[in-house]
Amino acid sequence: MTEQIESMELAAVAHIKATKNDTFVHITDMTGSETIAKITGGMRVKAQRDEGSPYAAMLAAQDVATKILGRGVKVLHFKLRGAGGVKPMALGPGAQTAIRTLIRAGLRVGRIEDVTPVARDRVRKRGGHRGRRV
């Protein structure tokens, strides 16, 4: 009888916050206390209007992938976050691109989870008594 012993693979958590204005790719250890790498889309492009684009998210994810592969991380658990609260719950345009880029870099996917904050009671919207005058 042969026993197959799996090698211990280092796992990490990828916290991806994708809004319409920017995409954050933040890699921590499993507890979330130690940051391994943190890069935003705005750090990789020059024009401010391009910070939230899928291209900026791809560049940020490529840089993060090279850093964490150098540290020996093989498995990633994804936690995706949109703006949430009073703002839109939908993820920004860079979320899918960031995930796809990290997978193409050779990292395995553990689990994907949506952690967008949801307001249980509606937070009072801006505008005051007479409403927001546009």
UniProtKB/Swiss-Prot annotation:
<protein>
    <recommendedName>
        <fullName>Small ribosomal subunit protein uS11</fullName>
    </recommendedName>
</protein>
<keyword id="KW-0687">Ribonucleoprotein</keyword>
<comment type="similarity">
    <text>Belongs to the universal ribosomal protein uS11 family.</text>
</comment>
<dbReference type="GO" id="GO:0005840">
    <property type="term" value="C:ribosome"/>
</dbReference>
<keyword id="KW-0689">Ribosomal protein</keyword>
<dbReference type="GO" id="GO:0006412">
    <property type="term" value="P:translation"/>
</dbReference>
<dbReference type="GO" id="GO:0005737">
    <property type="term" value="C:cytoplasm"/>
</dbReference>
<dbReference type="Pfam" id="PF00411">
    <property type="entry name" value="Ribosomal_S11"/>
</dbReference>
<keyword id="KW-0963">Cytoplasm</keyword>
<dbReference type="GO" id="GO:0003735">
    <property type="term" value="F:structural constituent of ribosome"/>
</dbReference>
<dbReference type="InterPro" id="IPR036967">
    <property type="entry name" value="Ribosomal_uS11_sf"/>
</dbReference>
<dbReference type="GO" id="GO:1990904">
    <property type="term" value="C:ribonucleoprotein complex"/>
</dbReference>
<comment type="subunit">
    <text>Component of the small ribosomal subunit.</text>
</comment>
<dbReference type="InterPro" id="IPR001971">
    <property type="entry name" value="Ribosomal_uS11"/>
</dbReference>
